[in-house]
Amino acid sequence: MPFEAVIGLEVHVQLNTKTKIFCSCSTSFGETPNSNTCPVCLGLPGALPVLNKEVVKKAIQLGTAIEAHINQYSIFARKNYFYPDLPKAYQISQFEVPIVSDGKLEIDTKEGAKIVRIERAHMEEDAGKNIHEGSYSLVDLNRACTPLLEIVSKPDMKNSEEAIAYLKKLHAIVRFIGISDANMQEGNFRCDANVSIRPKGDEKLYTRVEIKNLNSFRFIAKAIEYEIERQSVAWENGRYNEEVVQETRLFDTAKGITLSMRNKEESADYRYFKDPDLYPVFIDEKLLKEAQKINELPGAKKIRYMKDFNLKEDDANLLVSDPLLAEYFESMLNLGVKAKTSVTWLCVELLGRLKAEVTLENCGISAHALGALAKRIDEGKISGKSAKDVLDRLLEEQGGDVDTLIEQMGLSQVNDTEAIVKVIEEVLKNNADKVLEYKSGKDKLFGFFVGQAMKNLKGANPSVVNAILKEKLD
């Protein structure tokens, strides 16, 4: 029996505010455990939360980017549950009236463009972090009270490819509009996947399973694919009702399987109620208009790149996958580098040289340095082959001045036409017999003349050498 998957995603985006959502503690990552804490984020009696206005602004920006409705009145609620990393025994979140609702994202699929509806996005605080070591566990509350936006999609995705396309689009958006670093390794962008299956053509929604805390696109895809397979096999073996229950599962990255964690709670289990310590959020027109001024979105940027610079779709997609890539590209254009040259030296030459532990951000080569190198190629002052040697040196030395390196490495091309003509005439004079052979039909000798000229010139613009040689020989 053919099945189709029904997939909905809950994405937790950690906002890049300097301080936490309800207190003035720092949100910096990697600090000494429990050093960025105060009575509010420790949940001590009598401590009262105060909402960080920047969190509201960033929520509005996200809502604008996903074409959603911004609720100018929203409320905070307490989500009650007990866990060691939740010192208050409740999480401050939004339930009945979220700040953002009814959004959408358009994704590219094999069948063409598809709209994924977004039910809501709400503000909430993050929990702390449990660290399990051997037979005991530690709790680090530095992350407690860090601001999150939880973005909840409708169950509109049918396979792992669509889910990853949606996540990558959302991941790019939150970085381009500047509301989150979205560093998945640091937990800034985490995903819970709700997965169920049904016979193709059936509109009924069957038992869904939630897979928690997935923080890499590769593992998200693998977890979804495994869960679809597990549920399909259970159905075909007549054990669907026994083996597929509403529960929360974890993905074992080493074994590539999902494992049962606990029964999935319903909203009633959390006993949501309005938080009495926080006023409702009222957004006036001034704040709304101010926050709705967002950076150019990756989709619009992609269209502009293809239209204005005649880029291929694959190249444009790569450039808008990362704000820093787009920034480098535009900086190179501003230096006068041709679009095609910029793409080649940024996306092929530089990215192709970066190793797993080295990123564009920490490679040491600035957009200005890469642009200067690419511009020297456009100007004919250095050959593409020589430029690769300069790029290798820049990476090795974590930066440097391009023109100084070209000079030190003796890679400048001769562009002086008179000097090139003089050398070519000398080459032809010294090889008069081969000139006669060439003129009698041995066209392959042209490469010999080019090689001799380039050797004597010790670096010259090949296109200029070729043009002058052709003129002299023909």
From Swiss-Prot:
It comes from Helicobacter pylori (strain J99 / ATCC 700824). The gene is gatB. It catalyses: L-glutamyl-tRNA(Gln) + L-glutamine + ATP + H2O = L-glutaminyl-tRNA(Gln) + L-glutamate + ADP + phosphate + H(+); L-aspartyl-tRNA(Asn) + L-glutamine + ATP + H2O = L-asparaginyl-tRNA(Asn) + L-glutamate + ADP + phosphate + 2 H(+). This is Aspartyl/glutamyl-tRNA(Asn/Gln) amidotransferase subunit B. Heterotrimer of A, B and C subunits. Allows the formation of correctly charged Asn-tRNA(Asn) or Gln-tRNA(Gln) through the transamidation of misacylated Asp-tRNA(Asn) or Glu-tRNA(Gln) in organisms which lack either or both of asparaginyl-tRNA or glutaminyl-tRNA synthetases. The reaction takes place in the presence of glutamine and ATP through an activated phospho-Asp-tRNA(Asn) or phospho-Glu-tRNA(Gln). Keywords: ATP-binding, Ligase, Nucleotide-binding, Protein biosynthesis. It comes from the Bacteria. HAMAP family: GatB.
